[in-house]
């Protein structure tokens, strides 16, 4: 329990080594893929931590001035950028085209991602009725914009997902930051 207490606090790129952030994102992404496709090929974690996959900042780390100024809580911008909730895995080729744009600018790139956790930021894939894919993405949230309220909602969603991935009991008032 001592280790769990030490881990509390925001999960940010400043507090946690990059390879650990990548691993956490990979496990979350892998879980969704396995639930959706039921394919053992998705069991290999190296698929998600390969050199062809990058950590994408949804709220850009180096934004254009117009992107930064459009954020609803400008004074909190820097604190949100490195948080786990603001990160997602994205194929390197797609990430190169969306780099420092607004969420609206990045949406078309996210839709092209093969990772359901990333794709679902803007579009929740559906196939038929009550299919394995639909059940896998049911609790994922899509967003029309990326502001402080969206960040809070995704934080709650990722916390629920993390509890499933690591078979953790739900503790009242605890969320992934």
Where are these regions (language model features)?
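Long, cytosolic, alpha-helical-rich C-terminal regions that act as interaction/scaffolding modules
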Residues: 80-83, 87-177
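Intrinsically disordered, low-complexity N-proximal targeting/linker segments that flank membranes
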Residues: 1-68, 72-80, 84, 89
